[in-house]
Amino acid sequence: MLSNYVVKEILNDNKLKREYEFTIDNKYFFSQLDAKLLEIAKNVKIPGFRAGKASIDLIKKEYLNNAVNTLIRKIVEDTSSEFIKNGKFGEIISSNVSIISCPDYGMDVSSTSGDPVGDNLVYKLSFEVMPEAPLIALDDIVLSDIEADIQDSDISEFIENLKKQCSEFVEVSDSEYRVKIGDKVIVDYQNRIKGKMLKGGDTKDLAVIVGRGLVLKDFEDQLIGMKIGESKSFPIQFPDNYGVAYLVGKSADVSVTVKNIFMMKAVEENENVIKYYQFKDEQALKDFARNKIKQQFDKISFAIVKKELFDYLDKTYSIDVPECVVTQEINKINQEIQDSAGTVQVDVKAEAMKRVKLGILLVKMSRHHNISINKDDVFSFINTYYSDYGINLNDVLRMLQSNKDFANYISGKVLEDKVINYIIRLVKKDKKVMTTQELNLMLENM
């Protein structure tokens, strides 16, 4: 097909962007169009004619526009694919085609395709190529090797937190006791707007743990200081993010009666924790605490060493990064900032370029050293990074199967961590022993 089109280079910035203008030979175009129309004529059924017996003029009248548009798509696909294959451009990240002009075959092609009419089929092909990345020189890298200094105070603090988790609510018998944050309160309440009871607004025996944020904050705040048997009325306003659309922004009058109060009774002795969690003895409890602290320590130290490595790679290596990938990363970072309610402060473009550059370096490393991931790697990653947040692992696994974007995201993260661990294993180490407090302080200052 090379003899049927001419290619002119219109952009080569000596980096990653390429643009070429393709002009398709008219004789070739029209011969292909005639062949397409004959193919249609042989197979199409037109009322009043037997299959294949309709005149070519009738076929043109009915099917010319469709035939031209189909042919243009095929020629563009065939010529651009052939050119890219023969051009040996390497890995192409994104491409775009724009039609400059189309042949005039006695009809207004622009009326159906939106493309201008001209003497030849001319189109522009634009694309970006993946840059050639250097291989990371492992001999030049020195990273921290952080060893945990877990102290008795760390274990005691961990066990104290376990005690809070196995605490229980006990009924308050003092009639003068007033509701405090953390108490569980049993209430009856009614909601009215302009005197009219809301649907579902008359509720009995609602249990509210004050301070948990499971009901409106204005409602919780009004419960603080109330006694058993006390009733009160107060206004509330439904917030903009309230789950019931027709109530958003509206004010309501609430009447509430406290029927019972339960206060949290903390577990005081280790024996209670041992019994609650079914540990063999106190030493088993302490071993469990030490192991959990070590796991958290290792996660934090990995994050710190990972940042050390990324900072080194960013400073040491310079790569031209594809603009289209940077744009995608900018969108991701902006979404992260939005999700964090503005608590993340970062130079978005610089961070996006850094992430793309590091990704290219790590992909080069994975390919050179044949590093790949399997199902066990994915499951281990999910278990490590999701189990601490109370997320059901089966839900995550189902999402992996049903959501392609999520699956690609997880696969990318798993490969990234596997390459990083490979690098950490082979580079020089600077041994450091740190307490959990020192490690957490370092994490805060990252």
Swiss-Prot record:
HAMAP family for the chain: Trigger_factor_Tig (MF_00303)
Stretch forming the signal peptide: none
Keyword Chaperone set for record: yes
This enzyme's EC code(s): 5.2.1.8
Gene source species: Ehrlichia ruminantium (strain Welgevonden)
Alphabetical keyword list: Cell cycle, Cell division, Chaperone, Cytoplasm, Isomerase, Rotamase
Superkingdom classification of source: Bacteria
Start and end residues of each PPIase FKBP-type domain: 182-267
The protein's name in its UniProt record: Trigger factor
One CC-aspect GO term: cytoplasm
A GO BP annotation: protein transport
Reactions this protein catalyses: [protein]-peptidylproline (omega=180) = [protein]-peptidylproline (omega=0)
Family designation: Belongs to the FKBP-type PPIase family. Tig subfamily.
One Pfam assignment: Trigger_C
EC category name: isomerase
